UniProtKB/Swiss-Prot annotation:
Classification via CDD domains: bZIP_HLF
Protein name per Swiss-Prot or TrEMBL: Thyrotroph embryonic factor
Regions of compositional bias (Low complexity) in chain numbering: 133-160
Family membership: Belongs to the bZIP family. PAR subfamily.
Regulation: induction: Accumulates according to a robust circadian rhythm.
Keyword Zinc attached: no
Described purpose of this protein according to its UniProt entry: Transcription factor that binds to and transactivates the TSHB promoter. Binds to a minimal DNA-binding sequence 5'-[TC][AG][AG]TTA[TC][AG]-3'.
GO biological process terms on file: positive regulation of transcription by RNA polymerase II; regulation of transcription by RNA polymerase II; rhythmic process
SMART domains: BRLZ
Domain of life the protein comes from: Eukaryota
Residues covered by region (Disordered): 1-63, 132-176
Keywords: Activator, Biological rhythms, DNA-binding, Nucleus, Phosphoprotein, Transcription, Transcription regulation
Amino acid sequence: MSDAGGGKKPPVDPQAGPGPGPGRAAGERGLSGSFPLVLKKLMENPPREARLDKEKGKEKLEEDEAAAASTMAVSASLMPPIWDKTIPYDGESFHLEYMDLDEFLLENGIPASPTHLAHNLLLPVAELEGKESASSSTASPPSSSTAIFQPSETVSSTESSLEKERETPSPIDPNCVEVDVNFNPDPADLVLSSVPGGELFNPRKHKFAEEDLKPQPMIKKAKKVFVPDEQKDEKYWTRRKKNNVAAKRSRDARRLKENQITIRAAFLEKENTALRTEVAELRKEVGKCKTIVSKYETKYGPL
């Protein structure tokens, strides 16, 4: 019997139940088996949008690293290098600053002595490498060993300094010693004690010979001889003038020496008093040092 549409109904299997058929169950099993394969393909070949996002993230990370490196370089060198500057030399704006050459060489690890530098230049490459390795190996020991060796070095340095201090100093020339003495003589006396046309007399440095300090012998004056006017000829007056000049010269020399001796003696008296006061102060200091040493010896034993 046909329905209104004129079509025919498909034949119905009388044994088929209301649930799904065997074809549907087989399709579900096929889908569950192909799911891991699809996931693996997606992981190996991601979509285009995901790849673009990943590439953009990588580029952004590289840009951030480059910006950080540039900021670090700028902070490390805030000023342009000196070879980029042009310094005009006009004699006024150019100022040369002081630089300690030894300190600069020490900071850069360059030997200061030319002998050491020449020795290193003449050495072959193998020996230089051996020296560098030896220096690195000596610098690498732990801090405990350095702490052990440092006191011995300090002790040896202190012992050498003590030996140098204990050595007897070289003798001092007494002529080079100057004592601080408040001595200001009268300038007029200095002029009278100076040789005319020569240097000004210096009582601090001037020294007399032994013959100058000896008392001069008394010379008896010759008896006066009366010469009448008739015998006073030209020869007589010439001899008389020569005698007067010689007498005046001897008197001036004697007075000059007397003035020099007087001023020099005044200075020596002042210097002697100053030296006596210094010696008294030194004796006091020596007495204090002796008391300190005696107290130390009574407490800790002899030195």
